[in-house]
Amino acid sequence: MYICTLMRNSYRNLLILTLFTTLFTTACSDFRKLQKSDDWEKKYDAAINYYEQGEYYKANVLLEQILPIIKGSEKAEIANFYYGYTYYYQEQYLLASHYFKTFYDTFNRSKFAEEARFMFGYSLFKDSPRYNLDQASSKEAITALQGFINLFPNSEFVPKADSALGQLRSKLERKAYEKALLYYDLKKFMTGEYLKAALVEFDNFQDDFPGSEFAEEIRYLEIEAMFKLAEVSIYSLKKERYLEAIEFYENFIDTYSNSKFQKKAEKIYEDSLEQIRILNT
C-alpha cells in the first residue's frame, strides 16, 4: 500500500513537471514568434500584457522593437512610459532614469509627466551607492528630486521625494565626516600637512552640514587639530595657532556647554594658555 501511494505521488509530480515544462516551452516559443513578427500592433498588445503580468524583460524587448515604429502615434505615450518602468523593475536604474527623463521631455503635457519626472530622480536615488563609495550619482539624484519638488510642490510623490532626499543627504554627510576623519588620522604620517587638510575638511563639513549629528565631534576635533598643528609649527606661527585653538574652544563651549568632550577640550584650552605663557617669557 505504501509503495503504491509513493508511485501515485511520483506519477502525479511527473505529470505536473511535464505540464509545467510544456507550458514554459510554449510560452518561450510564443515570445520568440512575437519577436520575429512584423505585426507591430500584435507586439504592442503583447508588450502591454507582459508588462501588466510583471514580465518586464519580455515587455522591454518588444517595446524596444516597436518604439521607433509607433513614434508620433497615440500609443507611443504609454509605450514610452512603460518602457522606463521595465528598466526600473529590472533594477537597471540608470537606464530607467534616462528613459523617464526622455519621456518627461517629450510628453511634458501627458498625464504621466509628473510621475515620470519624479521617477527620473527616484531612479537615480535607487542607483545611489553606499556612503563610502563615490557619491556623484547621489548629488545628481538630489538635484533631480529637488527639481521635481520645485516643479510639483503639491504632488502626491513629494513625501517619497523628501524621504529619498533625506537618505541621500545623510550619505553625503557620512561621506564628508569619514573624509574629515581620514585626513585627521593621517596626521601621524605627514603631521603638519594632514592637520591643515583636516582643518579644511572640518570647516567644510560645518558649512555643508550645520545641523549634523557629527557636528559636536567635528567641532571638538577642530580644537584638537589646531592645538596639534601649533605644536608642530615653526616658532613664528606657534602663538597664533595656540590662540586659534583657544578661540575654537570658546566657540565650542558656547555651543556645547555640557559636551561629552568638555574635559578634553578644557585640557587643550589650559595647555594652550600655558604654551602661550611660555612663548611670552
Language-model-derived ranges and their functions:
Residues 2-4, 8-11, 24-281:
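Acidic, polar-rich low-complexity tracts and alpha-helical solenoid repeat scaffolds
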Residues 16-25:
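Bacterial N-terminal signal peptides
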